[in-house]
């Protein structure tokens, strides 16, 4: 057949025609065949439908809705019995089907957690599955749901004809759970365990404590489902809960529309007959057929489920989120545990998902309108039907230019809006455009048509020019130029950039018509850290690591070789030859000095205990020493005057000389004549050569040179034992016939005269001095000290420079500490014990691969001790430096660390400088001192001391002149520094002992650690006394008092002997004095207060196999006293825990408190003390307004949280037998009556409620037997807890119920996008009543307190004021009388205090409460290292280094600019002062108080009399010296700052706004807002010096830096009117020329060191205020702990959504951030009573008008309303008051009416610094 015919027959038209014709003829074959096919299809469909699971949704639905459900869920047979008529029936039906679909997708034998599910529905099932529902009651609707489900389930049970045993058990269990939860709720018990049940609990899934492992065999898998319940659950919280409960898969659903992603504020949800509305950060769901309440959820949380793919849980597990399908408006999702990928090495992944928008038939159409308020063109976009827009475009383009009119287009659009003309007839369409949009559509189309026609003409012209046959050179060049540079001119381009910057829209794109995207692409990625990282955080392969190790080892070997060569050239103090590395031993050796042997012995053995026992050993090798020195020593005995190279000042008495003589005579044959050799032949000393076999031995045989003198005993009854390093055989044997002192001398001779062996000699070897040789540590003198005859000296030094990263001249150079660049030369090696220098912190010790926890902990503890010494010595250097530089000049003022100085420069008996003697406040004399001279103070040495004793007085060696001074050798000059650091310094001998132990005492097996974890007072000490056998066991404890108590009890209860009692020691005493004891078991009392390494050291040294630790896991643990390091292994690894929960000390209410607050988990604490009640609280509302509210009760123990509070309490209690300790110091002690005090209202991490407060609360509450009274200035957690205990019934106290506060959920932040950015007019409404009500809402009750006569009562009444020792009062001044001053009467009643009048009482109160109450830093801080690292970081983070200007500061122009800014009065005062620079005392300041009292903006008691702010200011001539320089430096700093770092120089809100305009309001941030307390008064030397180092970057020279530092160190302030003089140490004087700048940069640099500011996106600093933004989601640790422990700042961190800075809120207004002043500060000041005349009122009005301009925008007031509600925790909206406030400050007449004034406005000019 022809192919064309076949093709026609097989075409669709022919086939359709045939089928239609044949199928309609009844009886035809084709008709019958088609009927059979259709019948078969119907039968198959019916059979398949029967196999589907039937679901009766029971809702009243129509046929269309049922058909829609069948289409959405084809795997189910959906029917309805229509027995329920409820709200949003379609949504409820879909929820039921979704529940069934997801439930059946899990295995039947698993356990399912249904989040927010209907437990009643699950309980009715008969499929054998088990479901636990988490149904928290977060609002009233949740409570309603619970009641509905209860009724539904009870009706199900009642209606059942037969209830199976299984269902009956389920019903009984549900009833039991309901009753238990209800009973607990009535008791206010809301703990997770209290709300737990079997089939359901009332906890959030994140807090659910149901344990599914209790079901069956405990191996059932857990799954999760969440049907429309995840809207408000943060995704990370959800997966973290899944990880905790081991839920591997979770499936769920939520309502979603693609319109949400494209930004539509309102959209339809047709499948559930509903709609959504986005309102700010919330999304609201409602239903058209539902009169009931809708649902409101967190939009930000919901969007995470749409946008995220990879989610990392809190514990590290990674979960994969998949959007599985979209059924109608319901999104199905699955979260699966994908952590196995990480195990397999997958560290990063990415995903892309496309969400279809289903908008193919729509286009984005631009519309324009006119804003009525601003008359500006406004723009918006609408989605219009593509068909309508195409018709409109076709019609508009076919019209001629004169036919395109608005009327014609609107007429056409109106007639064809929802109709289309086909064949001359109109047919309706489904979509219709809103008729209100037609005029705007017409406008857009007219402009669009005109632009397209103009564009068509341009294209036509260009095309014609291109198709010409002839070419021209000009045309080609023009085309190339336009192609490269564009046709637009440079001017137009610039205007374009400016327009874009100003957000000015223009061009053809304004009227562009675009298609809606088909889908929205969402990307997500995850990147996990590698498991292998080095200390710097960079990932390295094994080959790279091997290469680096080999390079490091080669470097160390070369460095060691060169060090040995240099030392060999310089060491001349041993009796043997020293062969250089790589040199033949046959070469002539270097000559040695004459006194070497004796100097070695004296330096090493000068201070020894007299009880040491030593074995005599035969001399194995000839002893070599100086014959001259030997003869002199025998004949005269004056060798003890030799200079000691270690800085140990030797103090010898007759008894020691006699012992030396006896020892010498007894051992003369063995030591001197029989086998002695002299290396200094008197006749021919120059020709002496050493033999080859006398070369130095290997380093393994070396003994360490360490001071072993009169070490301090920690325990007074501990007998001293020698610290000489002996072999075990020598130390264990004894010779009873030999005098101990003689044995000691013999052993010393053995060590001194035998061949000296050195180990690990490096360039940082110790300084050794003698009469003939001096080896200097400083690298800059190293070349000069090398032997001139050795040609290798210079080459060796050069080689050293080449090998090391630092030149030789900087290895051990003592720094010029006035410059940071010079401080970088500080020694970076381990300091010897007596070196007192700046040094960098030692590097953290490396960890070997095979190290166990014990080894790591011991190594870390050694490192901690070294760091502690480095930090302490750096502090000592700072104190010496301040002394040498003249910073200290008065003994009346305190000094750092209670430092004082004893000078032997002029007085041989010694003279205390400034008349200040050192006595430790509780322990007496110091064990160490730092000796230095003025000329060479950088070579200071730490020496051990001997003080007055009875024998010295008998011998006449003590006199009244030196009875309070240590014993120093005759002829020793210099200055001795004593302070709290040098008092004990046990770290030095302990470190020496432990380093030896770490190398030699290695136990193969780690001891087994058992912790007796007992509550306070449980009898831990009693357990030790009963269980410890002192014959073969050992007992150590942390505190001396505990050790003494244990010894007494062992003696009385166990009849222990004196020898046995020596096995009960403090840990320090054991490490210092006992090296020989061994024990199988070590009992360690309060072991948790010690570093784990210390415990392991004690155990290993004792060879103990078991350690029984007594401790309390909830009390204060080991505290790291070196702030700049982080400890990883400080906590013990416990093998076994024995719990003791019975206390014999604490009363019943304390036991109940410990139980209720779950300090010990679920354990119940019981007490044997029958006392029922012992707790009492006194808070700010109970009269605790100041420290004077605390009663002085003899015999009571006073406890404080902070050391500064302890000192304040001691001053308050005065002289007498008062017991005051910190909570930390009191741990382990017991008292009858305790007063616990919190004297500060500001937050601290150890205050109750703080991050680390729990141990301090436990210790503080459990010290007493009879009573505890808690006095607190803040109503903190402990205050409320103890107050709550007072209301507990006595019967309940015996039951120890649990209690915890109600948990609340915090919503996240989602900002609304705004298009318009125009100011909105504020309505002129409101009255005086609105202002008063606004104030009373925030501060109820504050306005009714009258304080008018408070100042009068203080000035005239009897007042007892304790004067600090640094205060002096001269009573011969004329007393100022209080005068009554009244002004205008304010109509507003606020808590604005009256102005105070200066007087004696006011001045003393201000000094005592402010300047004299400054906190003191307790931690060890290495200031040198902190300053260096902080300044280096500041250069990178704060400044553009290319703009740092360090040129000369002192210029005539700069001084002139500063001069013109001064007032005429100040200029006259400076001109009248003719003192020269040498006559000016920069440390002397004037003192006054501010009359204005800072008003309280909180609910703290108004009855407390607030101390006035103090002003400490220098003479004008001092400001003339520093003022121009500081002004220029601050100008240079401003220029060099990076754009995102803002320095607020007292700018107004309008001036600050440009600084934040670069911030995007659509981008969320993590904000840090710090509030400092007593900022000026908390300054230490660290603040002063770090700011000076910063200023040096900008040109501050050394002389001015010195004078500036001196002016802020020890200062004298004088109140010349009232006769008060005070001495102040390290405080920022509030009236000097750079107070604001110094405060700003002190705060900025401290925050830089404490926070990762390099990641900050915005930061602004001004005075003590700061505001910092970090990227959203970044985890930021609270810096307050570090600011307190390192920078001495008492502060708290604010976490507000609406941030504040310098009294101004940073708010989002339109498209920008703006600053707006705090309205409540203004409102409070409107209650002033001292405004006297119209002029001052006009000045105030003008100032308010300048500063509050932003209130003219209604949007600002709206944002402020939200901000103040959050900041002041208002219970309602205060917009009415803000409107009234704006109204009253915009009109002078209304403003004057606030003060009952009717005068006229006086035009005045107000300066920037005007304050009212």
Swiss-Prot record:
Residues 720-733 have a biased composition (Polar residues). Residues 1565-1678 form the RdRp catalytic domain. Gene3D superfamilies: P-loop containing nucleotide triphosphate hydrolases (3.40.50.300). GO terms for molecular function: ATP binding; ATP hydrolysis activity; mRNA methyltransferase activity; RNA binding; RNA helicase activity; RNA-directed RNA polymerase activity. It catalyses: RNA(n) + a ribonucleoside 5'-triphosphate = RNA(n+1) + diphosphate; ATP + H2O = ADP + phosphate + H(+). Residues 1010-1272 are annotated as: Helicase. One of its GO terms (biological process) is methylation. Residues 79-306 form the Alphavirus-like MT domain. Residues 979-1140 form the (+)RNA virus helicase ATP-binding domain. Its EC number is 2.1.1.-, 2.7.7.-, 2.7.7.48, 3.6.4.13. Residues 58-820 are annotated as: Methyltransferase. Residues 543-573 form a coiled coil. Keywords: ATP-binding, Coiled coil, Helicase, Hydrolase, Methyltransferase, Nucleotide-binding, Nucleotidyltransferase, RNA-binding, RNA-directed RNA polymerase, Transferase, Viral RNA replication. Pfam families: RdRP_2, Viral_helicase1, Vmethyltransf, Vmethyltransf_C. Residues 1141-1303 form the (+)RNA virus helicase C-terminal domain. The replicase large subunit is translated as a fusion protein by episodic readthrough of a termination codon. When readthrough of the terminator codon TGA occurs between the codons for 1303-Lys and 1305-Arg, this results in the addition of the RdRp region. Heterodimer of a large and a small subunit. This is Replicase large subunit. It comes from Potato mop-top virus (isolate Potato/Sweden/Sw). The lineage of its organism: Viruses, Riboviria, Orthornavirae, Kitrinoviricota, Alsuviricetes.
């Amino acid at each position: 057949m022809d192919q064309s015919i076949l093709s026609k027959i097989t075409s669709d038209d022919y086939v359709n025609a045939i089928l239609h014709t044949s199928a309609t003829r009844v009886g035809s074959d084709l008709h019958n065949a088609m009927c059979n096919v259709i019948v078969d299809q119907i039968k198959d469909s019916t059979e398949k439908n029967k196999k589907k699971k039937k679901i009766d949704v029971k809702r009243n639905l129509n046929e269309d809705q049922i058909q829609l459900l069948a289409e959405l869920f084809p795997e189910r047979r959906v029917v309805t019995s229509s027995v329920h008529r409820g709200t949003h029936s379609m949504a409820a039906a879909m929820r039921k089907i979704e529940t069934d679909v997801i439930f059946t997708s899990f295995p039947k034998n698993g356990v399912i957690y249904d989040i927010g599910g209907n437990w009643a529905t699950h309980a009715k099932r008969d499929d054998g599955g088990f479901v636990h529902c988490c149904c928290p009651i977060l609002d009233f609707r949740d409570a309603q749901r619970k009641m509905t489900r209860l009724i539904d389930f009870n009706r199900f049970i009642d209606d059942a004809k037969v209830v199976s045993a299984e269902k009956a058990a389920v019903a009984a269990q549900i009833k039991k759970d309901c009753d238990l939860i209800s009973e607990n709720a009535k008791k206010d018990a809301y703990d997770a365990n209290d709300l737990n049940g079997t089939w359901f609990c009332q906890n959030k899934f994140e807090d659910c404590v149901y344990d599914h492992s209790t079901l069956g065999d405990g191996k059932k898998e857990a799954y999760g489902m969440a049907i429309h319940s995840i809207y408000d659950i943060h995704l990370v919280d959800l997966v973290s809960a899944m990880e905790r409960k081991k839920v591997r898969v979770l499936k769920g659903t939520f309502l979603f529309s693609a319109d949400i992603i494209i930004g539509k504020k309102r959209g339809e949800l047709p499948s559930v007959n509903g709609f959504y509305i986005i309102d700010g950060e919330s999304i609201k769901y409602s239903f058209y057929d539902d009169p009931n309440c809708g649902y409101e959820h967190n939009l930000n949380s919901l969007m995470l489920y749409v946008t995220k793919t990879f989610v990392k849980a809190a514990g590290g597990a990674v979960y994969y989120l998949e959007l599985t399908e979209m059924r109608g408006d319901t999104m199905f999702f699955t979260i699966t545990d994908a952590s196995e990928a990480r195990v397999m090495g997958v560290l990063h992944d990415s995903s892309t998902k496309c969400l279809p928008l289903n908008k193919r038939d729509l286009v984005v159409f631009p519309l324009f309108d006119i804003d009525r308020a601003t008359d500006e063109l406004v723009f918006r976009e609408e989605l219009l039907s593509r068909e309508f827009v195409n018709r409109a475009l076709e019609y508009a383009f076919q019209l001629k230019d004169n036919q395109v009119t608005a009327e014609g287009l609107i007429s056409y659009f109106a007639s064809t809006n929802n109709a289309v003309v086909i064949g001359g007839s109109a047919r309706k369409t489904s979509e219709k455009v809103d008729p209100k949009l037609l005029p705007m559509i017409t406008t857009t189309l007219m402009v669009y048509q005109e632009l397209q026609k103009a564009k068509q003409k341009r294209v036509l012209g260009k095309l014609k020019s291109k198709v010409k046959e002839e070419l021209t050179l000009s045309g080609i060049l023009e085309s190339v130029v336009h192609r490269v540079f564009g046709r637009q001119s440079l001017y137009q381009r610039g205007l374009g950039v400016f327009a874009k910057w100003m957000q000015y829209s223009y061009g053809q794109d304004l009227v562009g018509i675009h298609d809606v995207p088909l889908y929205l692409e969402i990307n997500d990625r995850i990147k996990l850290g590698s498991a292998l990282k080095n200390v710097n955080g960079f990932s390295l392969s094994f080959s790279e690591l091997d290469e680096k190790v080999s390079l490091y080892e080669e470097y160390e070997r070369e460095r060691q070789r060169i060090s040995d060569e240099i030392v060999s050239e310089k060491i001349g103090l041993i009796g043997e030859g020293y062969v250089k590395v790589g040199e033949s031993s046959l070469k002539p050796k270097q000559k040695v000095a004459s006194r070497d042997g004796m100097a070695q012995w004296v330096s090493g053995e000068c201070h020894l205990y007299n009880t040491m026992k030593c074995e005599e050993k035969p001399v194995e090798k000839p002893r070599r020493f100086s014959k001259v020195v030997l003869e002199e020593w025998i004949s005269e005995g004056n060798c003890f005057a030799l200079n000691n190279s270690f800085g140990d000042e030797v103090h010898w008495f007759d008894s020691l000389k006699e012992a030396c003589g006896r020892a010498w005579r007894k051992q003369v044959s063995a030591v001197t004549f029989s086998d002695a050799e002299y290396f200094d032949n008197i006749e021919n000393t120059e020709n002496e050569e050493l033999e080859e076999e006398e070369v130095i031995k290997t380093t393994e045989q070396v003994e360490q040179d360490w001071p072993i003198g009169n070490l301090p005993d920690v325990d007074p009854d501990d007998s001293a034992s020698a610290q000489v390093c002996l072999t075990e055989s020598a130390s264990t044997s004894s010779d009873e016939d030999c005098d101990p002192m003689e044995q000691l001398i013999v052993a010393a001779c053995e060590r001194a005269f035998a061949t000296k062996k050195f180990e690990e000699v490096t360039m940082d070897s110790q300084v050794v001095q003698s009469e003939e040789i001096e080896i200097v540590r400083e690298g800059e003198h190293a070349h000069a000290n090398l032997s001139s005859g050795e040609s290798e000296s210079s080459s060796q030094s050069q080689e050293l420079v080449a090998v090391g990263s630092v030149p030789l001249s900087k290895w051990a150079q003592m720094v010029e500490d006035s410059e940071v660049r010079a401080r970088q030369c500080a020694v970076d090696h381990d300091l010897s014990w007596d070196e007192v220098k700046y040094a960098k912190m030692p590097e953290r010790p490396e960890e070997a691969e095979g190290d166990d926890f014990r080894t790591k902990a011991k190594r870390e503890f050694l490192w901690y001790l070294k760091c502690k010494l480095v930090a302490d010595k750096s502090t000592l250097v700072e104190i010496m430096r301040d002394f040498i530089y003249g910073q200290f000049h008065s003994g009346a003022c305190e000094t750092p660390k209670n430092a004082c100085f004893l000078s032997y420069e002029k007085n041989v008996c010694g003279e205390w400088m400034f008349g200040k003697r050192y006595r430790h406040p509780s322990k007496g004399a110091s064990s160490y001192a730092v000796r230095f001279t003025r000329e060479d103070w950088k070579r200071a040495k730490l020496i051990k001391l001997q003080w007055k004793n009875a024998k010295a007085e008998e011998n006449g060696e003590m006199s009244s002149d030196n009875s309070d001074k240590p014993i120093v050798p005759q002829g020793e000059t210099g200055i001795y520094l004593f302070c709290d650091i040098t008092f004990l310094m046990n770290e030095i001998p302990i470190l020496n002992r432990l380093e030896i132990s770490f190398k030699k005492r290695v136990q193969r097996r780690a001891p087994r650690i058992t912790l007796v974890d007992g509550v306070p007072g449980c009898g831990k000490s009693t357990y030790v006394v009963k269980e410890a056998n002192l014959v073969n066991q050992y007992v150590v404890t942390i505190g001396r008092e505990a050790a003494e108590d244990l010894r007494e009890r062992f003696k009385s209860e166990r009849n222990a002997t004196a020898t046995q009692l020596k096995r009960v020691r403090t840990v320090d005493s054991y490490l210092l004095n006992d090296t020989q004891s061994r024990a199988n078991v070590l009992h360690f009392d309060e072991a948790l207060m010690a570093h784990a390494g210390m415990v392991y050291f004690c155990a290993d040294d004792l060879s103990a196999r078991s350690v029984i630790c007594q401790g309390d896991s909830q009390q204060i643990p080991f505290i790291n006293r070196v702030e700049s390091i982080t400890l990883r292994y400080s906590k013990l690894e416990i093998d076994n825990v024995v719990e003791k929960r019975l206390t014999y000390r604490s009363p019943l209410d304390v036991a109940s408190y410990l139980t209720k607050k779950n300090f010990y988990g679920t354990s119940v604490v019981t007490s044997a003390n029958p006392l029922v009640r012992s707790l009492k609280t006194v808070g700010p509302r109970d009269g605790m307004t100041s420290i004077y509210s605390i009663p002085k009760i003899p015999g009571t123990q006073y406890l404080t949280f902070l050391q500064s509070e302890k000192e304040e309490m001691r001053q308050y209690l005065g002289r007498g037998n008062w017991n005051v300790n910190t909570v930390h110091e009191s741990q382990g002690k017991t008292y009858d009556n305790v007063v616990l005090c919190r004297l500060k209202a500001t937050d601290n991490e150890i205050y109750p409620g703080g991050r680390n407060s729990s141990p301090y609360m436990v210790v503080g509450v459990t010290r007493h037997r009879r009573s505890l009274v808690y006095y607190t200035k803040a109503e903190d957690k402990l205050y409320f807890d103890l107050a709550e205990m007072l209301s507990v019934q006595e019967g309940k106290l015996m039951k120890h119920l649990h209690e915890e506060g109600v948990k609340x959920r915090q919503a996240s932040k989602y900002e609304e996008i705004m298009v318009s950015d125009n100011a909105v007019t504020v309505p002129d409404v409101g009255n005086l009543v609105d202002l008063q009500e606004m104030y009373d809402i925030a501060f109820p009750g504050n306005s009714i307190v009258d304080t008018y006569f408070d100042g009068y009562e203080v000035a005239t009444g009897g007042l007892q004021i304790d004067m600090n020792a640094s205060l002096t009062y001269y009573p011969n001044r004329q007393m100022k009388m209080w005068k009554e001053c009244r002004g205008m009467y304010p109509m507003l009643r606020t808590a604005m205090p009256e102005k105070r009048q200066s007087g004696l009482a006011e001045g003393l109160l201000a000094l005592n409460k402010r300047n004299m109450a400054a906190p003191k830093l307790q931690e060890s801080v290495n200031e040198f290292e902190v300053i260096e690292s902080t300044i280096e970081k500041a250069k990178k983070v704060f400044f553009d280094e290319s703009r740092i200007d360090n040129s000369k500061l002192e210029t005539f122009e700069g001084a002139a600019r500063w001069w013109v800014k001064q007032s005429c009065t100040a200029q006259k005062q400076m001109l009248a002062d003719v003192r020269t620079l040498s006559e000016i005392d920069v440390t002397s300041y004037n003192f006054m108080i501010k009359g204005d009292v800072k008003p309280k903006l909180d609910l703290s008691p108004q009855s407390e009399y607030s101390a006035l702010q103090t002003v400490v200011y220098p003479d004008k001539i001092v400001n003339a010296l520093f003022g121009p320089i500081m002004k220029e430096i601050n100008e240079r700093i401003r220029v060099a700052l990076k754009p995102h770092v803002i320095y607020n120089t007292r700018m107004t809100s309008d001036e600050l706004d440009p600084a934040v305009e670069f911030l995007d309001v659509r981008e969320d941030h993590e904000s840090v807002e710090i509030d400092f307390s007593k900022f000026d008064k908390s300054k230490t030397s660290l603040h002063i010096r770090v700011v000076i180092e910063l200023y040096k970057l900008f040109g501050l020279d050394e002389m001015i830096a010195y004078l500036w530092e001196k002016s802020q160190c020890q200062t004298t302030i004088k109140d010349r009117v009232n006769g008060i003089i005070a001495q102040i140490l390290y405080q920022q004087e509030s009236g000097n020329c750079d107070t604001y700048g110094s405060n700003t940069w002190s705060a900025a640099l401290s925050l830089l060191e404490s926070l990762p500011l390099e990641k900050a996106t915005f930061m602004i600093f001004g005075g003590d205020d700061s505001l910092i933004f970090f990227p959203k989601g970044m985890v930021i640790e609270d810096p307050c702990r570090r600011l307190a422990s390192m920078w001495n700042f008492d502060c708290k961190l604010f976490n507000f959504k609406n941030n504040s800075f310098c009294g101004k809120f940073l708010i989002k207004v339109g498209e920008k951030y703006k600053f707006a002043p705090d309205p409540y500060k203004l409102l409070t000041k409107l209650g002033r009573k001292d405004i006297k005349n119209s002029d001052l009122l006009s000045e105030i009005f003008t100032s308010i008008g300048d500063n509050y301009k932003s209130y003219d925008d209604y949007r600002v007031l709206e944002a402020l309303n939200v901000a103040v509600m959050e900041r002041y925790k208002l219970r309602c909206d205060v917009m009415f008051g803000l409107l009234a406030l704006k109204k009253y400050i915009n009109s002078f007449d209304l403003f004057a009416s606030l003060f009952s004034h009717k005068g006229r406005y006086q035009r005045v000019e107000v300066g920037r610094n005007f304050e009212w």
